[in-house]
Each structure stands twice: as structure tokens, then as C-alpha cells.
From Swiss-Prot:
It comes from Bacillus cereus (strain Q1). GO terms for biological process: base-excision repair. This is Putative 3-methyladenine DNA glycosylase. Belongs to the DNA glycosylase MPG family. Keywords: DNA damage, DNA repair, Hydrolase. NCBIfam families: 3mg (TIGR00567), PRK00802.1-1 (NF002001), PRK00802.1-3 (NF002003). Its EC number is 3.2.2.-. InterPro entries: Formyl_transferase-like_C_sf, MPG, MPG_sf. It is an enzyme of class 3 (hydrolase). One of its GO terms (molecular function) is alkylbase DNA N-glycosylase activity. PANTHER family: DNA-3-METHYLADENINE GLYCOSYLASE.
Amino acid sequence: MQAPPSFYEGDTLEVAKKLLGQKLVHIVDGIKRSGIIVEVEAYKGPGDKAAHSYGGRRTDRTEVMFGAPGHAYVYLIYGMYHCFNVITAPVGTPQGVLIRALEPVDGIEEIKLARYNKTDITKAQYKNLTNGPGKLCRALGITLEERGVSLQSDTLHIELVPEEEHISSQYKITAGPRINIDYAEEAVHYPWRFYYEGHPFVSKK
């Protein structure tokens, strides 16, 4: 079942934790690629110096952040790596959750090809398929084309995992500082990164 629009409303930190264990799905050329979300970071808008929307900055790039929750915010870093975010909070409140790492589930062969141009890969390469925001976007074929797409779409959405299959019973959720935001002054220390402790696909222990 797809996560309904109401799933993305409410406090961004709570939505971030709710996303853990759910499945990010992207249909590419009719083939389902997906992974279980195992690591996220919350960004809380105008008051968060690490957020693109800090101070209420409104640009062509960040416009989607000011819109309805439950949409995709995709951007480039270093001019080459895509990052996928889920927009949260009410319209006009530019907050979101960065998906940092996934455990691959569906379309594994397509994911391998997208990452390594081959399907015969080592165990180390397998662990590196989706253990970072740029890696998971490459693996799932998420690009700037997906910016602003509703997560109610058939091709890009969050699939809710039934409780009996949910990995939250196997892993403890841990909170800590976000990664690579050295510019963000006091916001560097906010414990707004959430991940499954000990999960092999988490990007940084």
C-alpha cells in the first residue's frame, strides 16, 4: 500500500522516523526498483542553517519545498550526484527528509547495472549499491526529472511495509548529527539523522 498524503504531514522529525523501514519505489521502463529506507536526515526549514530553505530562501530549486507535503525534492550536489528528499509539513513550511540509505529489494539486477554497468559484482560492491544519497539515486534512476513529482504517483512513491515484515523489530533506531553540513554553525550538532543501528547499508556508523 502506498503511503497516503497524511503520512507526510505533521512534525518533520516524526515523519523522518516513520520513513525508516518503509520502501522507496521507482518504476523505470516498467521495472520496479526499490529499497527499504534505513537512514534519513530531517531538515526543518527557515530556522535550520543546514536546510536549503534556511531563512525562508525561496528559489526555483527550492520552490517545491514550499508546496504540499508528500512530493519529491531532488537536487544535485557537486554537479553530479542526485539527492532525493520527501517534502513534509504544511504548505508554506519548507521542510523535508533526505533519504540517505536503502537496503535494495526489487530490481536488483537493474540496480547493479545502474551502479556498476554489470551484474557480477563483489560483496563489497553489493554493500555499496545504495548506502548513500547519491548512490541510491543512481541505483533507482532518480534524477532532476523527479523533482516536484507527487509521491502518490504510480512510478515514484513510498510503499508502507506491513508490520509483520517491518525490520524495526530487528534494529534499534539511533539519532545523531547530520553528515557533511560543516557550514551550518550550531545546526551541525542537531541530532536529526536517524538510522537503524548496525544495519549493513547505513552510510556512516
